[in-house]
């Protein structure tokens, strides 16, 4: 599909509403952020978050995967404007940074090894009600935005918060603020239908068996959300984008692996200064003796 076809695809509004674990959700694309590679408005209750994903067309010469995630909080989402002398929005809060990391952890492993195109994900709360927190749904929004734009992301991915009812002892998926007030567990778990990539937990001295049961239940909940996301993407019918993979020379790993025993011995030195000196000396020796001058000039000393 050409650029015009892709633009027409983004202009078609697609909405998928569903109920899971006693709460109402919605995924929507095609109306906002049409210039982005992919965009999704995800809603739980009356809380809405716009998540956009922009993927560069050209591969960058980085030695890492250049993925950036931002969670941009806006006062208007809770019906307020900034007070004081400065009326502009402030820098990202600590909470915003933590939410961005929550999105990064399940998203980053989903891209293929050697993928070097820049990817920028921005989650912006549009509306935040008094009961439904906007953080966990950002992961589903990021996953849906990437896949709706045809990015090479191995999704869907989702994130859930697991609480436990003080009255019935049953687990609660994405509990409201009121439900969390009496919960003795707050487990945040993210991943795909096949694996877990992030776990954060706080609890009031619950047993290991209960924590394991909560994690198992959370994985099942993630799988259910991924299934709903797949149904949404079937309506979007995205066109996969073309991309290239940076493949490293396999002989590099072989040359480095030949010195694993020496590196292991150096790391076992109890003296920190001596240990670091041995490691640096071994690295310099490997670079000098096992790599040509042309390779060092091309790849750098690191």
Predicted feature residues:
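Glycine-rich, flexible beta-strand/loop modules in the N-terminal catalytic cores of phosphate-handling
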Residues: 36-120, 125, 132, 200, ...
């Amino acid at each position: 599909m050409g650029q015009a076809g892709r633009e027409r695809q983004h202009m078609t509004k697609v909405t998928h509403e569903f109920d899971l674990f006693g709460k109402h959700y919605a995924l929507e694309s095609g109306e906002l952020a049409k210039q982005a590679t992919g965009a999704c408005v995800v809603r739980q209750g009356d809380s809405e978050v716009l998540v956009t994903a922009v993927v560069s067309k050209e591969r960058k010469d980085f030695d890492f995967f250049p993925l950036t995630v931002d969670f941009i909080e806006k006062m208007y989402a809770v019906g307020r404007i900034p007070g004081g002398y400065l009326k502009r929005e402030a820098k990202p809060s600590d909470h915003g940074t933590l939410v961005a990391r929550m999105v990064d952890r399940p998203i980053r492993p989903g891209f293929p090894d050697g993928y070097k195109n820049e990817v920028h994900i921005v989650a912006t709360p549009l509306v935040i009600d008094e009961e439904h927190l906007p953080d966990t749904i950002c992961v589903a929004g990021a996953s849906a935005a990437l896949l709706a734009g045809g990015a090479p992301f191995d999704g869907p991915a989702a994130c859930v918060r697991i609480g436990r009812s003080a009255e019935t002892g049953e687990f609660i998926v994405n509990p409201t603020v009121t439900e969390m007030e009496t919960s003795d567990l707050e487990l945040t778990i993210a991943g795909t239908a096949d694996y877990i990539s992030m776990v954060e937990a706080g609890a009031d001295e619950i047993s290991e068996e209960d924590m394991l049961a909560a994690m198992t239940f959370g994985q099942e909940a993630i799988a259910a959300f991924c299934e709903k996301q797949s149904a949404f993407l079937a309506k979007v019918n995205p066109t996969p984008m073309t991309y290239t993979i940076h493949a490293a020379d396999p002989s590099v790993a072989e040359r480095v692996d030949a010195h694993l025993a020496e590196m292991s011995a150096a790391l076992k030195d109890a003296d920190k200064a001596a240990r670091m000196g041995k490691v640096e000396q071994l690295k310099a020796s490997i670079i000098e003796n096992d790599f040509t001058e042309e390779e060092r000039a091309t790849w750098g000393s690191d």
